[in-house]
């Protein structure tokens, strides 16, 4: 939630190292004492010549560990012999079990050259990773490794960024250093770090390479002077801890990645409803009025959010006593809960250095970051001068739990249903070296002035309570391995990554801060700060509501964040370019980074949206997994009911989304169990079709639904690509035989979006929508059967209580259609009173041989609908012929 305050901030120390190949100047390493076993290989690596000390001191002795972990995964780790160099703590990213594989059974093979040491990873006769001809550099503050790539590779990943889904391959640098990035500019480092890339080689398969390293880094993709393609890692520290994984398809590769970083967390049923927020709701009356206006406009609103406006002078764990008084806030939350709706607020990591409970408790427990002389480390953010929680502190979880338990107490506080965490890169408005945070806060009016107090709501809100109507330190540790080498320059390392903010410490926490506990340096762990806050926040939410799935939406992420939280794509702006790029961002996070609860601020956060853009975005946003309208205080209000066409678009969007909610829930659950992505680029389902490799404006919503949005203003048509397959128009049911070519879809109203069902699919939908997901769960089901080219179709349905981390009972159905017969089988543990009331078979030109009161032909849709009354209590079979 960075605002215009930072737009004029100067870049500090923005030196950039050129593309010089230092590997040719450095001696590399020699492998000795090589030992090979059934499932592993180890070796000693010794510096092979005179140190070059390019950006630090060359380490003379390294270790090599190779593990054949499974038949599809290979672990290659190069680290210092003394294990003093920092490694990502297992408490942050638990390591996958490395036992059980063998070199003979593995699809991946490790080959090496001893002197100078280099290695290759092969799949069959194909080389996937090749470091030959470029010497390994392993220095105290700089590591470099280059791999050769095939010509014109199809590379994806290396987030977070707003560049193209398929990465550029010439003069391209991806910098990974989490930062507060207003307007999410292209070709810059953004909020998260995901050092994994996927190399898709068409019919030969897909493989991924994950570097488990949290230090700042530049990953360069370019060609040599003689045209040879390469990818090069340049990191500020850590070790080379690689995981190579392979699959026959991109989807298979994504599943393997999930096994390394952890399966995503399952979300509650209600979280897939529509959410509304805005930075700038002036008081609790305005929040209530927005809730009321949505109900009057007949636009379903599942969850209402409040930004930092609710806080007393922007201080976390406080309420503005005049604009958001506790009594009225509790009334608001009770009203929402009584109407089966939900409430979420924001919590930032930075705690105001002032007399408040969060600060006083933190100081008493010593859980804030300290400088190396033991004094409190201070920055400046929204509340003014701030302290920052140390997520490595042994007592940090207790502190965080206590703050949540007190402030969000259902009986005495604000009983939230989910949590929004922001500014957790961590952001610091005060530029480095920030020697006078008090002066900076004073000069920049932090905290900003609050709006005038309103004694009551100026307009009546029927149904709301009367109050909403108009009135007549722990000791630092220096011991332990894998913590980091001594005597490093933690502020200005010799090699400078291309951090858009300039120096490493600019607009964030100083990188020379040493954390409590093991004594990790912020220099090494900066990119983990947001994910560690995410984990602590998820734990705190579970502590206050044991057994219930906690929704936590975060801005800053690291690899594996999806196991704890969802992610919104940050402070975008109301432009068509950001509308378009949200698609590729969403696909990267959901399918490649395994963070499937994902979405962009619908209609844009910064600037002023337009009626057309917001109407189109409402339709697109309904196909994010996380669907929220949100914008900033200086922009015009953009709630969906503000414009007639946007309201109509939103109603249509939510109607389809809610009818599909169980399809969404089922596919999302599958990803949390297996890693199989729900949201997918086209090439995930058509991996041999080269025309899909660069397509980033269409996507699959599960395996069954192809979404092809209009992507520019003043347009009513879209050139949509249809692979060699059969598809059915969602609205008309008309069959479209794809031929591996573009098809122009015309006359697309601003309130519509082209949707097609992929042949071979059976989709369970609710028979009608509802105003809340609670009411939706009472609606019956309809099955839509879209036969494939071979005349068959299949699908699934998963149901549970919608909220429990470990449901007591589940319903897991499999649908198959073949030769006019529909079969339903599976696990029937979860009891529900709803039934399958109808089955619609697409692609039909004649009615079924059923009586008219049972079956009907919709010639306009080319579909036959058969009325049914199937209980979801046991297997069944229906003759649809």
From Swiss-Prot:
Glycans are attached at residues 171, 293, 373, 506, 572, 608, 742. GO terms for cellular component: extracellular region. Residues 448-463 have a biased composition (Pro residues). Residues 440-485 are annotated as: Disordered. Its EC number is 3.2.1.20, 3.2.1.21. It is found in: Secreted. GO terms for molecular function: alpha-1,4-glucosidase activity; beta-glucosidase activity; carbohydrate binding; hydrolase activity, hydrolyzing O-glycosyl compounds. It is an enzyme of class 3 (hydrolase). Its main location: secreted. It catalyses: Hydrolysis of terminal, non-reducing (1->4)-linked alpha-D-glucose residues with release of alpha-D-glucose; Hydrolysis of terminal, non-reducing beta-D-glucosyl residues with release of beta-D-glucose. Belongs to the glycosyl hydrolase 31 family. This is Probable alpha/beta-glucosidase agdC. The lineage of its organism: Eukaryota, Fungi, Dikarya, Ascomycota, Pezizomycotina.
């Amino acid at each position: 939630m960075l605002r215009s305050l930072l737009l004029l901030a100067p870049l500090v120390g923005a030196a950039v190292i050129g593309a010089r190949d230092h590997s040719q100047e450095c001696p590399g390493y020699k492998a000795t004492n090589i030992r090979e076993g059934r499932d592993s290989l180890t070796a000693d690596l010794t510096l092979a010549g005179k140190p070059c000390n390019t950006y630090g001191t060359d380490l003379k002795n390294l270790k090599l560990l190779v593990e054949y972990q499974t038949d599809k995964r290979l672990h290659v780790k190069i680290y210092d012999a003394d294990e003093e160099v920092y490694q990502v703590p297992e408490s942050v990213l638990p390591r996958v079990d490395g036992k059980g594989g063998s070199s003979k059974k593995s699809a991946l093979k490790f080959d090496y050259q001893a002197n100078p040491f280099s290695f290759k990873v092969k799949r069959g006769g194909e080389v996937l990773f090749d470091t030959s001809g470029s010497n390994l550099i392993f220095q105290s503050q700089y590591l470099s490794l280059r791999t050769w790539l095939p010509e014109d590779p199809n590379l994806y990943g290396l987030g977070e960024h707003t560049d193209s889904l398929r990465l550029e391959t010439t003069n391209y640098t991806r910098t990974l250093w989490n930062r507060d990035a207003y307007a999410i500019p292209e070709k810059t480092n953004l909020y998260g770090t995901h050092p994994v890339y996927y190399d898709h080689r068409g019919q030969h398969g897909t493989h991924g390479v994950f570097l488990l390293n949290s230090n700042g880094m530049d990953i360069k993709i370019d060609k040599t002077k003689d045209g040879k393609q390469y990818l090069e890692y340049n990191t500020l520290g850590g070790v080379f801890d690689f995981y190579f994984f392979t699959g026959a398809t991109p989807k298979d590769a994504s599943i393997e990645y999930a096994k390394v970083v952890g399966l995503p967390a399952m979300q509650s049923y209600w979280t897939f409803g529509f959410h509304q927020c805005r930075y700038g709701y002036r008081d609790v009356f305005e929040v209530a009025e927005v809730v009321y206006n949505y109900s009057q406009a007949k636009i379903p609103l599942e969850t209402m959010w409040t930004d930092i406006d609710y806080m007393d002078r922007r201080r976390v764990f406080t309420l503005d006593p005049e604009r958001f008084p506790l009594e009225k806030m509790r009334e608001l939350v009770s009203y929402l809960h009584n109407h089966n709706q939900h409430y979420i607020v924001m919590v930032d990591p930075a705690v105001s250095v002032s007399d408040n409970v969060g600060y006083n408790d933190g100081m008493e427990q010593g859980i804030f970051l300290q400088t190396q002389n033991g004094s409190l480390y201070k920055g400046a953010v929204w509340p003014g001068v701030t302290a920052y929680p140390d997520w490595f502190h042994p007592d940090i979880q207790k502190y965080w739990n206590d703050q949540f338990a007190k402030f969000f107490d259902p009986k005495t506080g604000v009983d939230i249903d989910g949590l929004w965490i922001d500014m957790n890169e961590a952001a610091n408005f005060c530029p480095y070296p920030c020697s006078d945070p008090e002066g900076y806060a004073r000069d920049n009016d932090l905290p900003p002035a609050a709006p005038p107090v309103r004694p009551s709501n100026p307009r009546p809100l029927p149904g709301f309570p009367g109050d909403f109507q108009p009135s007549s330190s722990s000791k630092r540790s220096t011991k332990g391995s894998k913590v980091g080498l001594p005597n490093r320059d933690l502020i200005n390392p010799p090699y400078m990554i291309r951090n858009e903010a300039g120096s490493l410490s600019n607009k964030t926490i100083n990188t020379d801060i040493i954390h409590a506990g093991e004594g990790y340096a912020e220099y090494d762990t900066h990119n983990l700060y947001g994910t560690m806050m995410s984990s602590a926040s998820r734990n705190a939410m579970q502590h206050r509501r044991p057994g219930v799935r906690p929704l936590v939406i975060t801005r800053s992420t690291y690899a594996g964040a999806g196991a704890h939280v969802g992610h919104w794509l940050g402070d975008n702006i109301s432009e068509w370019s950001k509308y378009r790029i949200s698609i590729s961002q969403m696909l990267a996070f959901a399918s490649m980074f395994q963070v499937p609860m994902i979405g962009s601020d619908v209609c844009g956060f910064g600037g002023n949206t337009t009626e057309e853009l917001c109407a189109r975005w409402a339709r697109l946003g309904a196909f994010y997994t996380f669907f929220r309208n949100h914008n900033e205080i200086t922009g015009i209000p953009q709630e969906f009911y503000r414009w007639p066409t946007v309201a109509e678009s939103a109603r249509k969007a939510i109607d389809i989304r809610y009818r599909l909610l169980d399809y969404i829930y089922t596919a999302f659950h599958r990803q949390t169990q297996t890693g199989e992505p729900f949201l997918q680029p086209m090439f995930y389902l058509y991996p041999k079709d080269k025309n899909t490799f660069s397509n980033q404006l269409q996507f699959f919503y599960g395996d069954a639904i192809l979404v092809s949005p209009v992507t520019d203003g003043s347009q009513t048509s879209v050139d949509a690509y249809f692979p060699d397959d059969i598809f059915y128009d969602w609205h008309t049911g008309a069959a479209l035989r794809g031929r591996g070519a573009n098809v122009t879809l015309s006359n697309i109203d601003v309130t519509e979006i082209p949707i097609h069902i992929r042949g071979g699919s059976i989709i369970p939908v609710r028979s009608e929508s509802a105003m809340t997901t609670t009411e939706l769960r009472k609606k019956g089901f309809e099955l839509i059967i879209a036969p494939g080219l071979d005349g068959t179709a299949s699908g699934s349905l998963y149901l549970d209580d919608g909220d429990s981390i470990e449901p007591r009972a589940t319903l897991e159905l499999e649908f198959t259609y073949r030769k006019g017969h529909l079969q339903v089988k599976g696990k029937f543990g979860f009891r529900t009173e709803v039934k399958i009331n109808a089955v619609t078979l697409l692609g039909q030109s004649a009615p079924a041989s059923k009586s008219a009161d049972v079956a009907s032909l919709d010639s306009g849709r080319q579909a036959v609908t058969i009325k049914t009354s199937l209980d979801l209590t046991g297997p069944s079979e229906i003759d649809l012929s």
